[in-house]
Amino acid sequence: MTEHLPTSQVSFDENALIAERRAKLLALRAQGVAYPNDVKREHYAADVQVAFANVETWTAEALEASGDRVRMAGRLMAKRLMGKASFAQIQDESGRIQLLIQSNVLGEDSYAAFKVLDVGDIIAVEGGLTRTRTGELSVKVNVLRLLTKALRPLPDKWHGLTDVEQRYRQRYVDLIVTPESREIFIKRSKIIRALRTWLDARLFLEVETPMMHYIPGGAAAKPFVTYHNALDLELYLRVAPELYLKRLVVGGLERVYEINRNFRNEGVSTRHNPEFTMLELYEAYSTYHEVMDLAETMIRDTAQSVLGTTQVIWDGAQIDLGPIFRRWRMDEAVCHHNPEISVAECTDRDALLLHCERLKIKVKSSYGWGRLLLSIFEATVEHTLIQPTFITDHPVEISPLARESDIEPGYTDRFELFINGKEIANGFSELNDPEEQAMRFQKQVEAKEGGDDEAMYYDADYIRALEYGMAPTGGLGIGVDRLVMLLTGSTSIRDVLLFPYMRPER
């Protein structure tokens, strides 16, 4: 079907088109029918297409003889004028369907009104069904009403919304003209629903914890600061819900989870947005080994539920979520990719400093061996982890809330899940020793005073909660946006956020 659309966004005077459409709206206002709101839709495009899909059964003659009628509404996406008979296409949330519009069926006045409609207008139609000579199912329209006049023209069919920044800024237009974008966000909704269903079936309790914190804690990140006028109090948008969720475990809610927004005052990239969605859960009487099992099974089951497969392609890489995820100690992974580094050197600060210098990795003088080991891991190992891999046993220095290993002092019972070189999840056996936690908080305070903006604050109330006793607990955080990227094959986090952060338009 040929669309009556300009051939290029830059080849027409948009202001002139808008002025022309405003004139049409003015005429509608004069008639008192500019924005009617008394239409009842009974059918959707996709349902009609499926119900009458069999071409051999539902011939044009059979359709017209059946007497079936539809009442539909949607956006006019294409029109082709052909004298006394014309074709058009409308789009609703389910898909598109063709319209056959004939002056002798619709009536001369209504047909004339149809001819001056613009692509982008929202209309309601009623009629029977037929099939064209090419076999396309069509609504034979005998009632047509304009519901909403579109004042701005849509991008044309051939060039579409090619400006990526415009797609993000004007997501409402992107969703109209880009079916692939619409499908991503439908899948996002299904993914989050599948995660909830999975956890609810295992008797996890969904909870809501504060979005504004007196003390920003639960993650090493720089917070956004706000102010409560009535309380005369500085508050912080939360960087993580962790410390509040663990307070609930102290209170006896032994399996809790939250899917909500976190805010971190940091940079923007294809993997980072200052506002993002996290799934965080805690289970009493669980270790990090069991939490790894949980994370692996939940991600695999979610993929199977939403996609019908455990195999996905992400940024050109074929990812298989079906096999057991690899588990690899951080120090062993570093030594494997850097044969010059011995396992003994992984806890030797001076040796690691020399290796960082050799590898041209920039580090700060305040870094201990734990941060140095992490720096080497991030520079030489992380990007190589294509298939799902749990990196385990992180240094205490970079894990202030994780339980220290009983076997290897200086390391923790912690893991991070990497897929295609990107961190998807983080979890550990929780530190439930209040005195040890207080000592680690104090070290974080010293780091902050030394210029580390991402170091944690000292949370005295959380220490008080731990002093009442928290059961041995395992915790997990999954970046929902990155999981959606994985399961939709999206290469930028902005492609899976309806309204990603952008600098204001000038």
Curated annotation (Swiss-Prot):
Q: Which co-factor is required? A: Mg(2+)
Q: What subcellular compartments does it reside in?
A: Cytoplasm
By its UniProt entry, which PROSITE patterns does this protein fall under?
A: AA_TRNA_LIGASE_II
EC no.?
6.1.1.6
Any GO BP annotation: lysyl-tRNA aminoacylation
Q: Which residues bind Mg(2+) 1?
A: 416, 423
- Report the co-factor binding details: Binds 3 Mg(2+) ions per subunit.
Q: Does the keyword RNA-binding apply?
A: no
Where does the record locate the signal sequence feature?
none
Keyword field: Aminoacyl-tRNA synthetase, ATP-binding, Cytoplasm, Ligase, Magnesium, Metal-binding, Nucleotide-binding, Protein biosynthesis
Give the coiled coil ranges.
Answer: none
- Which Pfam families does the entry link to? tRNA-synt_2, tRNA_anti-codon
CDD domains the record matches: LysRS_core, LysRS_N
Specify which residues bind Mg(2+) 2 according to the UniProt entry for this protein: 423
Q: What class of enzyme is it?
A: ligase
List the Gene Ontology MF annotations in alphabetical order: ATP binding; lysine-tRNA ligase activity; magnesium ion binding; tRNA binding
Q: What is the catalytic activity of this protein?
A: tRNA(Lys) + L-lysine + ATP = L-lysyl-tRNA(Lys) + AMP + diphosphate
Q: Family, per the entry?
A: Belongs to the class-II aminoacyl-tRNA synthetase family.
Name of the protein in question = Lysine--tRNA ligase
Q: Native species of this protein?
A: Xylella fastidiosa (strain 9a5c)
